[in-house]
Regions:
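Polybasic phosphoinositide-binding surfaces of eukaryotic membrane-targeting domains
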Residues: 28-91, 135, 659-660, 666-668, ...
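Exposed aromatic-hydrophobic patches
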Residues: 694-705, 733
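Calcium-regulated, polybasic anionic-phospholipid
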Residues: 349-354, 358-367, 644-691, 720
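C2-type phospholipid-binding modules
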Residues: 408, 417-420, 597, 607, ...
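Canonical pleckstrin homology
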Residues: 53-56, 92-149
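Polybasic, Ser/Thr-rich intrinsically disordered tails and inter-domain linkers
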Residues: 1-50, 70-73, 602, 628-631
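Pleckstrin homology
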Residues: 61-119, 735, 739
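Long, acidic (Asp/Glu-rich), low-complexity accessory segments flanking structured domains
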Residues: 117, 147-162, 170, 178, ...
Length: 769
């Protein structure tokens, strides 16, 4: 780096110091040495391959939310990324690229930035372990602080950031031209007359620019929310402010919450920004808005953000978050296979992952989609990734669903890798000293990894000292493996056979794969630990024509459902009918963003996102005969009316950021999923050219017969007359996890990541029909 460049960067750093400090205060990091380190920046080696490893200067921008890096080329837009786009930062040689291209001795100098969505990971090497640690710690601090902001604080941060970008010359003043640019930045279109009127109203000094208090006035004018003003005005009965008694009245009357005066006082203490008001136990309008947009005001019941269900029931009594073809990042014909795909699925709470294993060169088993052009990943690397990430998002058991195509020798190596790498986490014996009679519970299996696959003998052989040891034998292929080869229609006697090594067989304890023929046959011949896999079409047929028998079967045994082999694009089927039939392991392609994955994410949103959700009692108790397709009187029938008022949206993202004048025309769709009789949807009209604060005030009414199986999805779309409507954001959750009253609905991207500052404001009421 030349002396001139160093001087330029030093000057820029001094210029940015004030703005950076202001943002540091906003992020809660004022005076933080790690933040200062990121603002100063430093050289890092960017790693793409063995031959492509280049020095780049990285620095945190003064807005404290943008990182840019500079090479010998001129500054380019694509050389920046937002803190909001980062999913996680991993210290060490955690990525496939760093493991492959960087030597072990540089382990502590390495770190990876993992992005949300499809953007490739950024693999970096610092000049020292200390610098690497500072980068990782600094970035994690900012990410954590941004995540901990409530919706209102994120909104304020976002608007201020947009204001800064609109201030082209950086003079901390706003001209009329800059104001128009700012309005487009925040996704709202205003005509020249309205913009001029707004500007003139705030330009009290008549200087032709807005500055200081004038900008503050403009900000307050812009962010004032009519719907909040009306609610606040109705309940703020103490000299125009809201006392603890007023707040208690609001919480009990509108929000239908069972709270005390002490609870109301606690909320004021927590959310009121004005110190004088707080000391007098009063809530200003700003404090009220913060209260509505934080955890307590969210549509998701805060109690459901933790594990709150009984986790001591048998595994078969839970819906289990499950992935299909977990190793794929994209489609099933030519997409890449990666350990990263396993990491992402596990971090999303997935508790059943699939491993499609084939013989590899040099005696090393590989994971990939057979008979296709998908890339390959080493089996042992996948097992290491599972070891490292299995229990970061959830402490409850992980099931490895093996689709084994390997020779005897490589099967033995597979068993060796699982035992040696997973260690004590791998379940190799049944729990207890006697042959069990039912599946263990998630509670009993905390921190354990189970293997699902073929087994040579019955489980009771483990307790039979006189048992004749079987070293190897042939077994029929997994049903899904047979489908890949076109054997699924053959009689059982003609199905493909594979030789199974005892070492691998012995690792299958509670999830022994068996072929399904009929429910009667399963009841007579199969034990509780023997489970079957069903192609989606077969499962759908059973769910439609024999739902009660399927539900009863799933009270004792596990069932796994997988997508049809014809879904080469990794598309997904509707999981709801399978859940309605009590199926636990409903495996979806996690790598494919779609409505079905939204519903899956919504199903497993409550209970602390732990990947296990307890089925309703009428799907666990053999005394009941529930049929979702033909509703009769029973404990499942709790007919209720769901009233939803879609009031407004806030700070919807621009879909085409490359076109400054591109503004969304949003509309909202509310969808109900559940038993066939409960499926419904309604949608608002679209609002032209306003993604900043569109308002609908539209009321809808839904009749729900089986609320315990109902799932609600809020979808926001951009209306388009010439082509298909574009996705903006969505949020899905079980009806039983929804809070009543005025609620904030966060919005997620297609890939399930939170959209900072964006949200819906709705009113929800559930009454007996």
């Amino acid at each position: 780096m030349s002396a001139e460049e160093r001087a330029e960067r030093k000057t820029q750093g001094l210029k940015d110091k004030k703005a950076a400090l202001n943002n540091g205060e906003l992020a809660g990091l004022e005076g933080d040495k790690d933040l200062q380190f990121l603002l100063n920046g430093g050289e890092l080696t960017k790693v793409k391959s063995e031959s492509w490893q280049k020095k780049r200067f990285f620095r945190l921008h003064e807005d404290c939310e943008t990182v840019w890096h500079k090479s010998s080329r001129l500054f380019k837009k694509e050389n920046t990324f937002s803190i909001n786009d980062i999913d996680s930062v991993r210290h060490g040689r955690e990525s496939e690229g760093l493991q492959k291209y960087i030597m072990d001795s540089l382990e502590e100098c390495c770190f990876s930035i993992i992005f949300k969505g499809k953007r490739k990971n950024l693999d970096l090497v610092a000049n020292s372990p200390e610098e690497a640690k500072q980068w990782v710690t600094g970035l994690e601090k900012i990410i954590t602080h941004m995540d901990n902001l409530n919706s209102q604080q994120k909104s304020e941060h976002w608007i201020i950031s947009c204001m800064r970008k609109a201030d082209k010359n950086g003079d901390n003043m706003m001209t009329l031209s800059e104001l128009k640019h700012f309005m487009r930045q925040i996704n709202t279109e205003v005509d020249d007359t309205y913009a001029a009127m707004l500007f003139e109203k705030c330009d009290t000094s008549k200087s032709g620019t807005l500055e200081g208090e004038e900008i503050k006035q403009f900000y307050e004018l812009l962010t004032s929310r009519q719907e909040i003003n009306e609610i606040y005005g109705k309940y703020a009965q103490t000299d125009g402010l809201m006392s603890a008694d007023d707040l208690l009245n609001f919480l009990r009357t509108e929000q239908r919450e069972s709270v005390t005066l002490e609870d109301a006082e606690r909320l004021i203490e927590k959310y009121e920004p004005n110190l004088t008001a707080k000391l007098n136990t009063l809530l200003t309008k700003d404090g009220f808005l913060r209260c509505l947009t934080h955890t307590e005001g969210c549509i998701l019941n805060p109690a459901h953000k933790q594990v709150y269900q009984d986790m001591s029931r048998p595994l078969s009594h839970y819906f289990i978050s499950s992935s299909h073809n977990t190793y794929l990042m994209e489609d099933q014909l030519k997409g890449p296979s990666s350990t990263e795909a396993y990491i992402r699925a596990l971090l999303k709470g997935c508790r059943c992952v699939e491993l499609d294993i084939w013989d590899g060169p040099n005696g090393e088993p590989l994971i990939y989609h057979g008979h296709t052009l998908t890339s390959k990943v080493l089996f042992r690397d996948v097992i290491k990734a599972i070891r490292d990430y299995a229990f970061k998002a959830s402490e409850y058991p992980v099931i490895l669903s093996l689709e084994n195509h390997c020779s005897m020798e490589q099967q033995k190596l597979m068993a060796h890798y699982m035992v040696s790498i997973l260690g004590s986490a791998l379940l190799t014996q049944p729990l207890g000293n006697e042959m069990p009679t039912a599946l263990p519970s998630p509670q009993e299996l905390k921190g354990r990894i189970l293997v699902k696959g073929k087994r040579l003998n019955k489980l009771d052989a483990v307790f039979n000292n006189n048992n004749v040891t079987v070293e190897a034998d042939t077994v029929s292929e997994e049903d899904e493996a047979a489908e890949v080869k076109g054997n699924e229609q053959k009689p059982k006697s003609e199905k493909s056979k594979i030789r199974l090594a005892k070492e691998l067989s012995d690792l299958v304890i509670y999830c022994k794969s068996v072929h399904f023929s009929t429910f009667e046959n399963s009841k007579e011949k199969h034990s509780f630990y023997e489970m079957s896999s069903f192609k989606e079409s077969k499962a759908k047929q059973l769910a439609e024509n024999a739902a009660t028998a399927f539900i009863r079967h799933n009270m004792e045994k596990l069932s796994r459902i997988y997508p049809a082999g014809s879904r080469t694009d990794s598309s997904n089927y509707n999981p709801v009918p399978m859940w309605n039939a009590g199926c636990q392991i409903v495996a979806l392609n996690f790598q494919t963003p779609c409505k079905q994955m939204d519903v899956n994410q919504g199903r497993f949103l409550p209970n602390g996102k732990c990947g296990y959700v307890l089925k309703p009692e009428f799907m666990r108790n053999p005394d009941f005969n529930f049929d979702p397709n033909n509703l009769s009187v029973g404990p499942w029938l709790k007919k209720t009316t769901l009233h939803i008022m879609v009031i407004s949206a806030q700070q919807l993202p621009k879909l085409n950021k490359d076109k400054p004048k591109s503004i969304v025309d949003p509309f909202v769709k509310v969808e109900i999923f559940g038993v066939p009789g409960d499926r419904a949807s309604e949608q608002t009209h679209h609002i032209n050219n306003n993604g900043f604060n569109p308002m609908w005030n539209k009321r809808y009414k839904f009749t729900v017969n089986v609320p315990e199986l109902a799932i609600v999805r809020f979808l926001v779309m951009d209306y388009d007359t010439a082509s298909a409507n574009d996705f903006i954001g969505q949020y899905t959750l079980p009806l039983t996890s929804m809070q009543m009253g005025y609620r904030h609905v966060p919005l997620l991207t297609e890939r399930g990541d939170v959209i900072p500052s964006a949200g819906l404001f709705v009113h929800v009421m559930l009454v007996d029909a």
